[in-house]
């Protein structure tokens, strides 16, 4: 990063916290208040990304008898009180935390919602490589109303494909998406088997696309038939729990691996809808002089990533 900045003498200031930005009164431009004083600018590009503030759903119980924390504040099993753990959310954070806790000897329940679970590696190539050669980084933005689901992939122990059946056979109890709480009881949707089936479908679809690409291009990448072999469905999938008494199960902690949201409270301009989502077209805001970068699916799948954001930066 430092070398790239030096290559064109970018006037970068590091270690600066922005407190607020708002329009100047009586003349064009904006005033930005920072930890190193005020700055005036004619344009603002907000490239702070979508992961600014941890989200815990409103269904979280109000009980003080059990510790609750967001995955953003989880560091290791030793920080948690004794007892079992209910991990809610089975994206990359949730599955890796559940795996680590189970390996540390904890009793773990993992609440699994809708997800994609791509292969970490397939035919000696990383998942990110496959997204590139298959053109998936440049896939157009999701159509309005199309569901966005979390991605379950692990970087632990060198990285590996997430396999929910393997987690269950390892000792993690899988449950469906959490729908609420009733006193000491956690309540789950009866959707566990369907969520796993859909995750399998997304996984197999990528393997099929990769195999077809290898055949078309005559690449010498070894076949990997074992990637299509699944363990049998464990009992927690074939006969899933629909409720769980936390006290009776000895659960002392709930970890909410439920993602993040944006936080634009510092940007005091008329560029947001009623839900405080940026209003823009390909990053060009409805507020003149304000632009956004790094948002999910801003124009394509890669818009949130370093290797994909350049398309949107060039457009702006």
Predicted features along the sequence, with ranges:
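Flavin (primarily FAD) cofactor-binding/catalytic cores of flavoenzymes
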Residues: 2-316
């Amino acid at each position: 990063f430092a070398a790239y900045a030096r290559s064109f003498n970018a006037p970068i200031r590091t270690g600066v916290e922005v407190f607020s930005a708002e329009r100047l009164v009586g003349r064009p431009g904006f005033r930005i208040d920072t930890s190193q004083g005020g700055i005036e600018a004619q344009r603002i590009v907000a490239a702070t990304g979508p992961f600014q503030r941890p989200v815990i759903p409103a269904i979280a119980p109000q009980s003080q008898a059990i510790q609750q924390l967001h995955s953003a504040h989880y560091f290791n099993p030793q920080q948690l009180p004794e007892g079992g753990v209910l991990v809610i959310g089975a994206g990359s954070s949730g599955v890796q935390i559940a795996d680590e806790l189970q390996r540390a000897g904890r009793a773990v329940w993992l609440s699994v919602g809708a997800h994609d679970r791509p292969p970490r590696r397939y035919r000696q190539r990383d998942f990110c490589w496959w997204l590139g050669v298959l053109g998936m980084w440049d896939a157009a933005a999701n159509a309005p109303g199309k569901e966005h689901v979390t991605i379950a992939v692990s970087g632990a122990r060198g990285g590996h494909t997430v396999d929910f059946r393997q987690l269950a056979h390892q000792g993690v109890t899988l449950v469906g998406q959490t729908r609420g709480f009733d006193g000491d009881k956690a309540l789950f949707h009866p959707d566990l088997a369907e969520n796993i089936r859909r995750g399998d479908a997304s996984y197999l679809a990528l393997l099929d696309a990769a195999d077809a690409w290898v055949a078309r291009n005559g690449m010498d990448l070894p076949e990997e038939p074992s990637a299509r072999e699944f363990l049998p469905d464990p009992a927690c999938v074939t006969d899933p729990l629909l409720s769980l008494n936390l006290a009776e199960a000895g659960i002392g902690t709930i970890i909410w691996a439920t993602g993040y949201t944006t936080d634009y409270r510092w940007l005091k301009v008329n560029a947001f809808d009623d839900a405080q989502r940026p209003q823009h077209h390909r990053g060009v805001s409805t507020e003149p002089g304000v632009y956004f970068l790094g948002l999910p699916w801003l124009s394509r799948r890669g818009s949130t990533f370093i290797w994909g954001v350049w398309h949107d930066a060039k457009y702006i």
